[in-house]
């Protein structure tokens, strides 16, 4: 059966005398050889601190060949991910029953997956989440490595998918031998078709020769009934509009810093502290000279001979200045914060905001793209809610990223006080540096007990306690 994606190609007269499988084979070969996939894999290697400095060579065997790796790319990625995803988001929906259902979906496991998707997106430019039901019938989100996905879009803006292919390798055991095979999964509105990639063409997986459903319902008699989503189940979470990963902006600077540091280390290791100038040395060769010097602390020279020494110049200030400049440029290009800045710790609240400007701008775009992805995921949440018989209105859903920013707490609290009467109480509380979502539950309990949640009358002042003790003494 032809997929809707293939029918669309036919209607647009984009194919001629070519089968659907042949098109998939062309796309797979092109994808595997593409620069985009190569860059994604390289980004993963740089995150694991496996950088190009390992390729550094020297022209003479005896020379030192340092290969210093600093983990700079990992630090930049983790800073952005930690800033936007480390703190628990504020997720809300009108209706107590709906909120309980929402909390069961966006639990710690799913929030951890969203954070992992954020790391994948920053590294590789785009991350992909696959909605599915687990063995307990719960809606989950599976992160697929970005380089495994070949998306087929309905539009040039890449807003809606027609289909997609996943290409991945897996170990298999045949006749007592462990082998690695490449598997291909083709997803569209009709379900999933499994293939095996031989390196040149596709073959249907003998274990699954028919299109499978996205999920199954099991009847009382154990019969499995396949179902498919009405939408292609793949959600892109982008780092930015162009799906450019952070390594695109930072690789050359990271390579330069590591090369300069490695070369500088080589120079210091190979440079002798003293250079000997020999005059009329009475010896066979320089090897004998060094041996006599180290062993006997003396050397033989003729009557008009002698030994002078020169102090080697090991000034590295120029190299260190270049490394410092490159480091500054790196954080500029990455739109990140250099935590080694001496002035960072003494900055006031307003100064901290200015220092976070670049990081905020970058994370604003990342947050905007993730809000789009979460909105797409809500469609699957609605289907899940309908199956559970839970009323779910996604138009009343909010997902707020709580950024992990260093702030001046006193200034933040005073800003909250100054906002009374301008903003609603909940908005003010959410901006308080000590706020946690659990506060709402405790405030509600206090109100039910007839206590003023903002009253401090339950606590005596120090001077009141003193007066009580004085009265007790008088009695």
What are the residue ranges of the model-derived segments?
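Extended, charged amphipathic alpha-helical segments
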Residues: 214-347
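A short, surface-exposed helix-loop junction/capping segment
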Residues: 95-102, 306-308, 354-356
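Short amphipathic alpha-helical segments
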Residues: 97-98, 105-114, 121, 249, ...
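Short secondary-structure junctions and interdomain/linker hinges
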Residues: 50, 54, 108-113, 121-128, ...
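Extended, helix-rich architectural segments
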Residues: 1-144, 470-475
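C-terminal helix-loop subdomains that flank or include functional centers
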Residues: 285-295, 318-321, 325-475
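Extended, regular secondary-structure scaffolds
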Residues: 128-237
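A general structural signal for short secondary-structure junctions and capping/turn motifs
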Residues: 118-123, 155-157, 174-176, 265-268
């Amino acid at each position: 059966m032809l997929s809707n994606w293939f029918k669309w190609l036919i209607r647009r007269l984009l194919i001629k005398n070519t089968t659907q499988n042949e098109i998939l084979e062309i796309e797979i070969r092109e994808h595997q050889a593409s620069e985009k996939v190569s860059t994604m894999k390289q980004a993963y290697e740089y995150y694991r601190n496996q950088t190009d400095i390992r390729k550094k060579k020297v022209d003479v065997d005896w020379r030192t060949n340092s290969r210093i790796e600093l983990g700079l790319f990992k630090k930049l990625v983790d800073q952005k991910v930690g800033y936007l995803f480390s703190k628990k988001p504020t997720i809300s929906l009108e209706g107590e029953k709906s909120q309980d259902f929402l909390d069961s979906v966006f639990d710690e496991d799913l929030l951890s997956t969203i954070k992992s998707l954020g790391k994948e997106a920053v590294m590789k430019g785009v991350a992909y989440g696959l909605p599915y039901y687990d063995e307990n019938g719960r809606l989950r989100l599976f992160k697929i490595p970005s380089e495994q996905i070949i998306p087929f879009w309905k539009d040039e803006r890449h807003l809606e998918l027609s289909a997609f292919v996943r290409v991945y390798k897996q170990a298999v055991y045949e006749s007592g031998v462990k082998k690695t095979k490449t598997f291909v999964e083709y997803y569209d509105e009709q379900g999933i078709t499994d293939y095996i990639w031989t390196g040149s063409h596709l073959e249907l997986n003998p274990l699954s020769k028919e299109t499978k459903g996205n999920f199954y319902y099991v009847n009382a008699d154990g019969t499995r009934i396949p179902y498919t989503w009405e939408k292609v189940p793949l959600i892109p979470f982008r780092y930015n509009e162009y799906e450019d990963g952070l390594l695109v902006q930072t690789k050359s600077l990271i390579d330069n810093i590591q090369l300069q540091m490695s070369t500088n280390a080589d120079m210091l290791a190979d440079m002798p502290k003293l250079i000997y100038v020999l005059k009329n040395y009475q010896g066979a060769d320089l090897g004998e000279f060094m041996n006599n010097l180290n062993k006997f602390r003396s050397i033989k020279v003729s009557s008009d001979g002698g030994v002078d020494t020169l102090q080697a110049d090991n000034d590295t200030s120029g190299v260190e200045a270049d490394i410092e400049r490159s480091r500054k440029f790196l954080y500029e290009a990455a739109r990140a914060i250099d935590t080694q800045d001496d002035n960072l710790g003494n900055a006031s609240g307003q100064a901290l905001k200015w220092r976070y400007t670049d990081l905020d701008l970058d994370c604003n775009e990342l947050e905007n793209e993730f809000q789009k992805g979460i909105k797409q995921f809500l469609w699957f949440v609605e289907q899940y809610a309908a199956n559970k018989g839970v009323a779910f209105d996604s138009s009343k859903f909010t997902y707020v990223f709580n950024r992990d920013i260093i702030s001046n707490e006193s200034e933040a609290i005073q800003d909250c006080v100054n906002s009374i009467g301008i903003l609603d109480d909940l908005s003010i509380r959410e901006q308080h540096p000590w706020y946690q979502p659990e506060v709402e539950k405790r405030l509600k309990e206090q109100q039910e007990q007839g206590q003023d949640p903002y009253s401090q009358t339950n606590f005596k002042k120090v001077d009141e306690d003193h007066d009580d003790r004085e009265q007790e003494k008088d009695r």
